Amino acid sequence: QRWWNIIVYLSDDLQPEHGGHLGLWSHDPETNLPKELKVEVEPKFNRAVIFDTTQNSWHGLPIELNTPKGICRQSMAVYYLTEPRIESCLRQRALFAPHENQKDNPEVLDLIKKRADSQNYSSVYRI
């Protein structure tokens, strides 16, 4: 079970206006969806971000990536894995929050749900 995510940003030519920021959302227990954007992290070169990955850890890109040709958002992700705690429910895969213009799109919400399902994620990805 993932316990922590560590993301290290490797691009030294990204500018704030290029987007690609990491967003961390609170969880809405009534809808089981992301509720409020709590933290937004600019992807600066050599910056490391550590965040927990509970069953309700929503993360994604609140500012869509928009880079000129030749510039890309590069990062390295490391996961700290542990045996599941007895008192915790089994963690599914990563929970990605939809963009503001996607949050009412049932197709996008279904894709996020399928992508997070540890048993059926292969129906979404080409493996």
Where are these regions (language model features)?
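Catalytic core of Fe(II)/2-oxoglutarate
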Residues: 1-2, 11-127
